[in-house]
A protein has these predicted regions:
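Extreme N-terminal, non-catalytic leader segments
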Residues: 10-60
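Conserved catalytic-core segment of NTP-binding enzymes
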Residues: 35, 161-252
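Walker A/P-loop phosphate-binding motif and the immediately C-terminal alpha-helix
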Residues: 55-96, 100
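NTP-binding/hydrolysis catalytic cores, primarily Walker-type P-loop NTPases
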Residues: 246-268
Length: 268
């Protein structure tokens, strides 16, 4: 083997005798054990090792609306779960306070901000690092949103672009879905790198005013390409949205999204 490292799953955590032996506590969820092991594997791969991309680059779908409480996250998660029934999909949230730790009641050791530290690593090491932080809701893969929202603010636009592009190219996904917000720098740069953008609208004057201001700003900054990629969606009134994230594959919104996939994504 090119790389050698001993790992031992024991009933206690902490360092054990042996310089090259990594101790992993067995009294934790299987997915946490997997993530610790993949993290160790990533650390073993020499920095000079390069891997060739063996699959096509993922299509990047961005969701952004200047309107608040417009079901953007519900739309994004439903889209991700519906697409993941046939494709490999990764969902990334850029919300300041996503609240996923509480919603899913899961222990999270790595998040989106942690991946920024590994941007300069080789493609092979980065791909393993990505696996070590990625979790799942059903068949949908997701990177846990940042726990401290300040980490979203401090990262520069080019860093987010580089991270998303590296994930799309070397992550092995068919689609990467970006649930975007104003919490990040460089949102226009990220939108430019999307293959398709969905912007949810509403009919009331306040919402229409926000959309008009947003589109005018894009033109002022010469970002017409974002407008060209954007599909605006005025959603129908849904009688109910599932409370649990795992249930987003059912209901009226799920039916709406599946029709959208058939007409706009599969037909493209």
């Amino acid at each position: 083997a090119r790389w050698q490292r001993q790992m031992c799953i024991r009933d206690r955590s902490g360092t054990i005798a042996g310089e090259n032996i990594r101790n992993i506590n067995k009294y934790q969820k299987a997915e946490n054990i997997y993530r610790e092991i993949t993290g160790e594997i990533a650390a073993m791969i020499p920095e000079e090792e390069k891997s060739l991309r063996s699959c096509d680059k993922a299509k990047i779908i961005g969701l952004y609306s200047p309107i608040r409480r417009c079901l953007q996250t519900s739309f994004a998660l439903t889209l991700g779960q519906a697409l993941s029934e046939k494709k490999k999909v990764l969902y990334i949230s850029f919300e300041h306070y996503a609240g996923w730790n509480q919603l899913l009641n899961k222990s999270i050791k790595g998040d989106l901000a942690a991946l920024l530290y590994f941007l300069q690593e080789s493609e092979e090491r980065f791909a393993v690092r990505l696996q070590s932080v990625t979790m799942q809701i059903g068949r949908l893969h997701y990177i846990p949103p940042v726990y401290a929202g300040q980490n979203l603010i401090y990262a520069k636009g080019p860093e987010w672009v580089e991270l998303v592009e590296k994930i799309a190219e070397y992550g092995g996904y068919d689609y990467v879905i970006l649930d975007l917000s104003e919490s990040i720098q460089g949102i226009f740069e990220l939108l430019k790198h999307c293959d398709r953008i969905y912007t949810i609208t509403k009919e009331d004057p306040a919402a229409q005013g926000k959309i008009a201001q947003y589109e005018e700003l894009l033109r002022d900054y010469r970002c017409e390409e974002i407008l060209e990629k954007t599909s605006k969606k005025l959603l129908p009134v849904f009688t109910g949205i599932p409370e649990r994230l795992e249930q987003y594959t059912r209901g009226e919104l799920a039916d709406y999204i599946r029709k959208l996939i058939s007409e706009e994504l599969e037909a493209a």
